[in-house]
Amino acid sequence: MGFPAIDQEKIYRNSMEATVAFLERYHADHYMVFNLRGRHAYDPSYFHNRVMTFEMDDHHPPRLELMAPFCRAVHDYLAADEQNVVAVHCKAGKGRTGVMICAYLVYINFYCSPRQNMDYYSIVRTVNNKGVTIPSQRRYVYYFSHLRKRNLNYMPLRCELIGVYFERPPRLNGLYFEFSFVFCFNYIFIFFFSFFLSHMELFHKF
């Protein structure tokens, strides 16, 4: 579903009031909400504190280490009572939500292949059969399937950044170019720097 909006977003998204009313009417005491916009949190008391949060950036794939815990949480809740349902949302309720729902379909072996699971999601979620369309997000569904089929657990490794290389720097009109770099790890700011290059310096360096 789309993000349950509280302020101006209610004009073009699901309102919090309408979302709560729907869940209370059809699934009272038997629903859990999964928020994939962790930094856009809301008061969980709207949903009687039945909210779990997983942070994912818009238009990005999830971190692999989040996919299995999400699937386990969904599966445990659904298995606890046959009346239980889960409501998963990001912003529009399509890309990030689709990745994690497809991961869960992989988790329960709903279809044999990641492609079949993503095709199924596209059919039941959208009117134009365009569900999970961003290549990196689709790729992570395949990654998760690979881990599941081989009973592997993903463990994040320590990485060392030793350089940044521009293979094709931008060619813009103007005398100077500004390059900026922002480094973050797990949404924690690490380092930032920027510098200017003249058109001639850029030509000689690259």
Predicted feature locations:
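Cysteine-based protein phosphatase catalytic domain of the PTP/DSP
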Residues: 1-86, 108-119, 124-131, 163, ...
